[in-house]
């Protein structure tokens, strides 16, 4: 078997900034009466006949087991005292741009992964600060002082570990993983904490008696490649803290969609839902093939009178998973006003895209 040298560039200084429960936090900032209350961004199921899905929620709501992509009905059952807010996504985008302007005060090497998180390469920065930890603290301070919002930061020598570190202490945390600490940090992590390892992959790894980073470290490269395909090559290196992917400031944002026009109009809900599922499947397959993930799902419906409706849902985390895209598409459709006209066109689109590599590849996608 052809072997590749394990080259680990530990000279860089990478920060990953992740806003804490961003949408909910913006709402709480703008409305002080929400302080200490469980806040859910999603339609109130009491007003929609039980329809709707959770986009995100604050940490108070998470104590009740509420999480993104959960049905609003289940979220209400778990936390009946929660405040449901439909969400003002244009406002969230405006705040997100304000955060990016703060990043640009320190470096132009900023790679936005979504509206509320980004990688920054501060190896060399505009203020000439040698300490990446100091830069991270200053960014957290600036975001709080200027926008009254908190974020968590991870600091390390590559994007993979910086991302893991930012999740380690939330909210408002700062975790630093130095090159000499990386191996110990990774070995102690449960395998499900490795970004991109989905539920099915966790089961498959558990079947191999892999429960932690330390367990993963024991598995040979050829075994991982044989079991997980080309991602095994990457996973072998990630277990050793090796990931030399650069911070890419000029990322091309596109959308992936599937639309179908029907010569014979669709009237029955079963037929419409079946066609939505076909579109969702096409979008998921295209996203996986293009190695893209997205966190905004849009559906488009055109009726027999050529009137057209579009509605979108922004998720807490990016996805390319068919089940998620399908479920959210159906939930969005259920929120549309009832229309007795026949359906002439249906479309599903995944947008707010990012590279699958940046999100950390899902083993399920590549095995």
Curated annotation (Swiss-Prot):
Domain UmuC: 14-198
Annotated Mg(2+) binding sites: 18, 116
EC number, as in UniProt: 2.7.7.7
Cellular component aspect of the GO annotation: cytosol
UniProt keyword terms in alphabetical order: Cytoplasm, DNA damage, DNA repair, DNA replication, DNA-binding, DNA-directed DNA polymerase, Magnesium, Metal-binding, Mutator protein, Nucleotidyltransferase, Transferase
GO molecular function: damaged DNA binding; DNA-directed DNA polymerase activity; magnesium ion binding
Protein's GO biological process: DNA-templated DNA replication; error-prone translesion synthesis; SOS response
SUPFAM superfamilies, per database record: DNA/RNA polymerases (SSF56672), Lesion bypass DNA polymerase (Y-family), little finger domain (SSF100879)
InterPro entries: DNA/RNA_pol_sf, DNA_pol_Y-fam_lit_finger_sf, DNA_pol_Y-fam_little_finger, DNA_polymerase-Y, DNApol_IV, PolY_HhH_motif, Rev_trsase/Diguanyl_cyclase, UmuC
Cross-referenced CDD domains: PolY_Pol_IV_kappa (cd03586)
Entry's localization field: Cytoplasm
Annotated function: Poorly processive, error-prone DNA polymerase involved in untargeted mutagenesis. Copies undamaged DNA at stalled replication forks, which arise in vivo from mismatched or misaligned primer ends. These misaligned primers can be extended by PolIV. Exhibits no 3'-5' exonuclease (proofreading) activity. May be involved in translesional synthesis, in conjunction with the beta clamp from PolIII.
Family label: Belongs to the DNA polymerase type-Y family.
NCBIfam families the UniProt entry points to: PRK02406.1
Protein name: DNA polymerase IV
Lineage, uppermost ranks: Bacteria, Bacillati, Bacillota, Bacilli, Lactobacillales
Gene name tied to this protein: dinB
């Amino acid at each position: 078997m052809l072997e590749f040298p394990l080259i680990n560039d530990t000279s860089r200084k990478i920060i990953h900034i992740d806003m804490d429960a961003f949408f909910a936090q913006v709402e709480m900032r703008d409305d002080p009466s929400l302080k200490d209350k469980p806040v859910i961004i999603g339609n109130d199921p009491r007003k929609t006949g039980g329809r709707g899905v959770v986009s995100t929620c604050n940490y108070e709501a998470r104590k009740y087991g509420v999480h993104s992509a959960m049905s609003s009905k289940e979220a209400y059952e778990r936390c009946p005292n929660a405040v449901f807010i439909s969400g003002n996504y244009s406002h969230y985008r405006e705040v997100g741009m304000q955060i990016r302007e703060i990043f640009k005060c320190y470096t132009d090497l900023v790679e936005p992964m979504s509206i509320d998180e980004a990688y920054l390469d501060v190896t060399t920065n505009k203020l000439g600060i040698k300490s990446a930890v100091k830069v991270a603290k200053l960014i957290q301070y600036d975001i709080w002082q200027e926008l009254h919002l908190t974020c968590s930061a991870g600091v390390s020598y590559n994007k993979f570990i910086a991302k893991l570190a930012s999740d380690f202490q939330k909210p408002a945390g700062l975790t630093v993983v130095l090159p000499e600490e990386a191996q110990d940090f990774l070995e102690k992590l449960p395998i499900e904490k490795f970004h991109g390892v989905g539920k099915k992959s966790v089961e498959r790894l558990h079947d191999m008696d892999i429960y932690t980073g330390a367990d993963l470290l024991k598995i040979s490269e050829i075994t991982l490649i044989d079991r997980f395909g080309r991602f095994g090559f990457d996973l072998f290196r990630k277990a050793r803290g090796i990931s030399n992917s650069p911070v890419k400031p000029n990322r091309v944002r596109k959308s992936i969609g599937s639309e179908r026009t029907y010569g014979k109009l669709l009237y029955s809900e079963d037929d419409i839902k079946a066609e939505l599922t076909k579109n969702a499947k096409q979008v998921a397959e295209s996203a996986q093939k293009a190695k893209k993930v997205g966190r905004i799902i849009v559906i488009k419906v055109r009726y027999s009178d050529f009137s057209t409706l579009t509605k979108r849902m922004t998720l807490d985390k990016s996805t390319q998973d068919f089940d998620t895209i399908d479920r959210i598409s159906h939930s969005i459709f259920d929120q549309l006003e009832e229309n007795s006209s026949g359906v002439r066109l249906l479309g599903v689109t995944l947008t707010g895209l990012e590279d699958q590599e940046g999100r950390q590849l899902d083993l399920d996608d590549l095995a």
